[in-house]
């Protein structure tokens, strides 16, 4: 769940930890969006639709590259015995081994499914869970720890260590305030801390956790309200700051993991990013309460070796003008196709766009509310 423009409305929101009220959801549909293919490695992907906060409308879609069919809202039909389906606000989705993990933020659990068919396996109870990464048989889940509400006295967050064989939480490590995305590099877990509930007193640090001892060893001062973090092949971390939505703008920073110090600043807004080889793709949907109270949108690409912006718009055919609110971003590691989701108003069905590697629209398809997170499936995994 990204920071949408009604940030302060969280102060009035108290959400139940159960799966929410009964909803009439969009039924499963099949749409032919592409020609059947014979991929070498990537056979398709799952897409997690967040659903609007409080609506209990998180849904799961699947694209089968071998048939070219896109199937929406598959979870309910696949798991008819699961009460009230996926839950409230799907915040992340990843695969590891034979399992598919969906982080359901406002329902306070991680849904664990079979990667092969999305059948329910179990749940991992973690309050206000945010994102998930994996390393050597363990899942690491960031947690705000407290309820979903703006609170200047909000407690420190933590990272839960989960045994992927038993789905049990085996340890917790306290980090900064309202921790977000994480990345593993060289036996260390790096955690971007936002402090988003403590507005305007945001956190501005990246926590460094030694995975051997599962203890925080350092905090790296970066910028206010951190969010995204990804690693590249050069031992660098790319960390985004949302800024404060007033005078301090969203920005992108580089951390050298050999020294655990900030090594660069790009001066570019980031709301979502993903890495493919030496290319870092960026969506910039930056909101400001000053300068017109609106959104500034960009689609940039960065060379991670040289740390330079090589393109200010990776969409080259003008389709970007159709996209109301760019939200999710992914790049197929085999075909290099680029996927961008449009959340529109956040309370209506969104759209997924597929672009060729050179930025031309290939196809689009309707999704659920706030389509956001993609997990690719590869042959031979799990």
Could you tell me what each predicted segment is?
Residues 19-382:
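Predominantly soluble domains enriched in secretory-pathway, periplasmic, or organellar proteins
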Residues 7-10:
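Sec-dependent N-terminal signal peptides
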Residues 14-17:
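C-terminal motif of bacterial Sec signal peptides marking the signal peptidase cleavage site
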Residues 1-5:
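Positively charged n-region of N-terminal signal peptides that target proteins for export
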């Amino acid at each position: 769940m990204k920071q949408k423009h009604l940030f302060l409305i969280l102060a009035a929101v108290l959400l139940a930890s159960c799966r929410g009220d009964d909803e009439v959801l969009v039924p499963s549909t099949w749409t032919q969006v592409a020609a059947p293919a014979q991929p070498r490695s990537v056979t398709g992907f799952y897409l997690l639709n967040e659903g609007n906060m409080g609506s209990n409308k998180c849904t799961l879609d699947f694209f089968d590259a071998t048939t070219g069919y896109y199937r929406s809202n598959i979870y309910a039909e696949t798991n008819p015995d699961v009460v009230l389906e996926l839950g409230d606000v799907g915040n992340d989705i990843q695969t590891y081994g034979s399992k598919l993990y969906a982080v359901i933020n406002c329902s306070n659990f991680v849904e664990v499914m079979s990667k092969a068919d999305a059948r329910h396996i179990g749940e991992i109870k973690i309050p206000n869970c945010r994102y998930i990464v994996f390393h050597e048989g363990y899942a690491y889940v960031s947690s705000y720890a407290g309820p979903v509400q703006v609170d200047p006295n909000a407690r420190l967050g933590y990272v839960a260590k989960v045994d992927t064989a038993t789905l049990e939480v085996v340890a917790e490590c306290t980090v900064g305030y309202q921790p977000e995305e994480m990345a593993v590099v060289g036996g260390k877990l790096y955690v971007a801390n936002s402090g988003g509930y403590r507005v305007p007193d945001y956190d501005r640090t990246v926590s460094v956790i030694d995975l051997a001892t599962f203890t925080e060893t350092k905090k790296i001062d970066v910028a206010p309200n951190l969010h995204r973090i990804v690693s590249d092949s050069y031992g660098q971390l790319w960390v985004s700051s949302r800024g404060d939505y007033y005078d301090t703008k969203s920005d992108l920073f580089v951390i050298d993991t050999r020294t655990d110090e900030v090594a660069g600043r790009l001066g570019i807004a980031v709301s979502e990013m993903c890495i493919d080889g030496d290319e870092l793709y960026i969506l910039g949907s930056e909101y400001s309460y000053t300068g017109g109270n609106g959104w500034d949108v960009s689609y940039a690409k960065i060379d991670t070796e040289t740390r330079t912006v090589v393109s200010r718009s990776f969409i080259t055919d003008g389709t970007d003008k159709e996209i109301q609110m760019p939200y999710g971003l992914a790049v197929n590691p085999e075909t290099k196709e680029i996927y961008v989701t449009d959340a529109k108003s956040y309370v209506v069905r969104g759209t997924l766009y597929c672009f060729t590697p050179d930025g031309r629209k290939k196809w689009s398809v309707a999704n659920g509310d706030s389509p956001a997170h993609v997990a690719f499936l590869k042959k031979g995994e799990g």
